[in-house]
Amino acid sequence: MLKSIILIILKLSPSSKKWFWEKWYNVFARNAKNTNLKLMNYGFHSPGLELNLQEEDEIERYPIQLYSFVANQADVKDKNILEVGSGRGGGASFIARYLHPSSVTGIDISKDAIELCSKIYSIPNLDFIVGDSENIPFADNSYDILINVES
């Protein structure tokens, strides 16, 4: 029954779909309090891809490898990066700590996810804001690279 209701909501219109996902991610962020869960993708493995990770990052090696693969398609060093759909912030944190951009901003529709990120991360070149991927609150050319992995 619940599944049927959700499917009806998702099929009504793009705005009802957006409303549902915003609510869903807020509920998830409020209730999934385990701050060890920083990434929500399935991960990536490729022979020869060997990242030297800090011990605390090893538990999420494969999801981090997906971010590494995607982000390294461009030279991110000293660039301003925007991650759209930053979720729990693990990808933006990885990029900020390992790939040496000038800055990383994570934007997510879930205010609860952004509040969680603000509590978890204290990295000088990393910040998070609430925002909508369909109406990004920055002027054109504010960022050098846009990354979207988990949405």
Label the predicted regions.
Residues 79-87:
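Conserved class I S-adenosyl-L-methionine
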